[in-house]
């Protein structure tokens, strides 16, 4: 069990087993209220730390092409700066203020909050757009929240983003691929649209490095009215937070099971500490669901430890109703426990959090261009992330952060900053986006952090093999442009259902593999009349199925607009398998001869991989398969697997799989 102590104090004694097995250092804690109490929305806005910088922000935006705002989470920069800009006239004359977020859930939450503060309905003066969902009005929306990726897609129709007067790139420190592409393109747009203002906002970003990136290296030609143009040199403004002191506690020894340790820590906080909500950081939906189940079972079996707990998950796949529960006030006499991914680090502000439990891990993608394998792995977080997590505990009053790792590890081993996603990901989707936007010299593109040439070259090779690029590395017509228009990863072929439960697999499992199983579930949902009761009986997520329907209809409209003729495969599942092969041919694997453990090897790179236990093909072990994604734990596991005929590989990608090379493997 985890044993916590506060640095600089004497090592505490061990508890007896009957006391719970997890040791906390008792420390003074003021349970007095924050003093905020009830206030009007306008009063609440004025109490935010960013309010006293309102005039400075508006002056800098007026006088500089780019303004970099560094502000702690909870300072109010995300919700207030777009409103300040609108109040100053930047949305007059039909212009729009854009604010991008790296995550869909954050887009929805922030748009709802700003609309509430302005006293308007979401979708009118304040709107948002995420993939497959547009809640905005072209004639009425003046403040628009959207993901970085959606704004990139808008560039395909309007390369200079002419309707926007100010574009605010929020949470820029997360350095997603879409964020880095967007920053590079916005820098180019500014040269054509000097009137465009950029606001780069972040909690932890290295402001000097970002300023250097936007600093123009070329002197602008002086012309009439030059004195009215904004300065090219970026302005930097640091906004204070309103945080209280947060006591940091570490474990003495590394924990063996961070999910179990997190659950134990929550129970002891609830048993020993004053009122206040708890925020737990875990790695993903699987870990979160396990922790929610463990805490819920504890609440049912042990009233002493867990009465009054409200246990809520928080990750990107939640329905809107489930999200609303997380943001709703905690009832009197209750304690809310929010178990979240790193989405709660900076993108979202949760009121009432006094205690944070930090596992020290998050899920990240890592790509090896040599083996051509991209893994979603559980990886250690950076010091910057750890500080952000701890800061969530001190928003309204003094708080505590319990880190499930040692102080020595934090000081001596944890990296200072995370690796930008562009430097650790498969770049196929990135390259096709740039090509569609007219950026042909992708190796010479102005990146905030340059990706490896090897990853770029591998992406070009794959796109050429798919028939998306021609011999001159330009998009083919019409296929290349059609693929670029569809708002999905080039590898994505539709999972159908997020929660792969054993009961559903027994009813709908297909011998061909997971993709056909998902298709069976989809057909069953339609035949039931899209019934929520049917979903409940079959252990299927009804909200996920509704989203599948919405996405299918939008993709259908896009296909018709692009002139793609849609044909049903009827009952011929071989066509489905061939379609998956055509899109995922680079992910082909062959079962190792005489393997008793179900070991496969990838055709490109000869990496050892195994079918994930959640797949309907687990322990079936067809000779040849294609997977959608890899997950690394003790082994590399294939998710969403389908069986194939190896001859389809050379049919689908003759440039990628040379017949003479593949024949010896097949036979």
Report each predicted region and the residues it spans.
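Mobile, glycine-enriched helix-loop/loop "lid" segments at the mouths of ligand-binding/catalytic clefts
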Residues: 364-365, 514-515, 522
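P-loop NTPase motor module signature
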Residues: 1-486, 537, 543-552, 556-582, ...
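Short, charged, solvent-exposed linker or helix-capping segments at domain edges/interfaces
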Residues: 258, 637-638
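N-terminal leader/propeptide and maturation segments of large enzyme subunits in energy/redox metabolism
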Residues: 524-543
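Extended, well-ordered protein cores
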Residues: 16-17, 640-642
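Leucine-rich, amphipathic alpha-helical/linker segments
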Residues: 487-503, 507-518
């Amino acid at each position: 069990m985890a044993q916590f102590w506060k640095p600089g104090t004497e090592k505490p004694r061990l508890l007896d087993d009957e006391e719970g097995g997890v040791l906390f250092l008792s420390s003074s804690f003021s349970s007095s209220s924050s003093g905020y109490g009830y206030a009007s929305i306008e009063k609440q806005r004025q109490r935010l730390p960013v309010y006293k910088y309102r005039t400075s922000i508006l002056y800098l935006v007026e006088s500089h092409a780019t303004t970099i705002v560094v502000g702690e989470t909870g300072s109010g920069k995300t919700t207030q700066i777009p409103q300040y800009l609108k109040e100053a006239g930047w949305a007059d004359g039909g212009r729009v203020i854009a604010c991008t977020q790296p995550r869909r859930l954050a887009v929805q939450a922030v748009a709802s909050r700003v609309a509430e503060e302005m006293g308007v309905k979401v979708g009118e003066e304040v709107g948002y757009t995420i993939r497959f969902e547009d809640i905005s009005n072209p004639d009425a929306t003046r403040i628009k929240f959207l993901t970085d990726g959606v704004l990139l897609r808008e560039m395909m129709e309007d390369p200079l983003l002419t309707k926007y007067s100010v574009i605010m790139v929020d949470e820029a420190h997360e350095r997603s691929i879409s964020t880095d592409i967007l920053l590079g393109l916005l820098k180019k747009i500014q040269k054509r649209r000097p009137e465009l203002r950029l606001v780069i906002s972040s909690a932890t970003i290295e402001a000097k490095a970002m300023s250097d990136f936007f600093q123009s290296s070329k002197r602008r030609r002086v012309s009439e009215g030059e004195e009215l143009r904004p300065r090219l040199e970026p302005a930097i403004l640091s906004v204070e937070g309103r945080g209280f002191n947060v006591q940091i506690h570490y474990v003495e020894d590394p924990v063996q099971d961070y999910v179990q340790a997190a659950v134990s820590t929550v129970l002891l906080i609830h048993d020993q500490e004053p009122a206040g909500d708890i925020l737990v950081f875990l790695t993903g939906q699987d870990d979160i669901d396990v922790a929610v189940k463990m805490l819920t079972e504890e609440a049912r079996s042990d009233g002493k430890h867990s009465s009054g707990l409200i246990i809520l998950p928080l990750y990107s796949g939640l329905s809107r109703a489930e999200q609303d529960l997380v943001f709703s006030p905690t009832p009197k006499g209750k304690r809310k426990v929010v178990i979240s991914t790193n989405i709660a680090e900076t993108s979202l502000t949760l009121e009432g959090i006094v205690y944070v439990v930090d596992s020290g891990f998050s899920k990240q993608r890592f790509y090896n261009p040599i083996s051509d394998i991209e893994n979603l792995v559980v990886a250690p977080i950076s010091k910057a992330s750890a500080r952000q997590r701890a800061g969530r505990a001190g928003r309204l009053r003094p708080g505590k952060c319990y880190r499930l790792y040692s102080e020595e590890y934090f000081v001596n081993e944890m990296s200072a900053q995370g690796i930008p996603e562009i430097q650790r990901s498969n770049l196929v989707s990135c390259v096709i986006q740039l090509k569609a936007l007219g950026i042909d010299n992708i190796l010479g593109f102005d990146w905030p952090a340059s990706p490896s040439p090897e990853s770029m070259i591998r992406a070009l090779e794959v796109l050429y093999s798919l028939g998306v690029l021609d011999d001159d590395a330009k998009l083919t017509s019409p296929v290349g442009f059609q693929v670029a228009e569809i708002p999905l990863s080039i590898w994505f072929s539709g999972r159908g259902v997020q929660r792969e439960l054993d009961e559903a697999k027994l009813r709908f499992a297909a011998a061909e593999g997971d993709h056909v199983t998902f298709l069976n579930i989809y057909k069953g949902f339609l035949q039931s009349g899209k019934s929520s009761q049917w979903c409940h009986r079959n252990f299927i997520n009804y909200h996920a199925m509704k989203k599948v329907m919405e996405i299918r209809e939008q993709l259908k409209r896009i296909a018709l607009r692009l002139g793609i003729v849609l044909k049903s495969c009827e009952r011929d599942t071989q066509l489905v398998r061939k379609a998956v092969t055509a899109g995922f041919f680079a992910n082909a694997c062959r079962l190792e001869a005489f393997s008793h453990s179900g070991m496969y090897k990838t055709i490109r790179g000869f990496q050892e991989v195994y079918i994930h236990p959640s797949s309907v093909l687990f322990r079936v072990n067809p000779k040849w398969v294609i997977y959608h994604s890899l997950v690394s734990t003790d082994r590399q596991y294939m998710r969403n697997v389908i069986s194939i005929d190896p001859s389809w590989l050379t049919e689908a990608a003759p440039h990628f799989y040379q017949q003479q090379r593949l024949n010896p493997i097949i036979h």
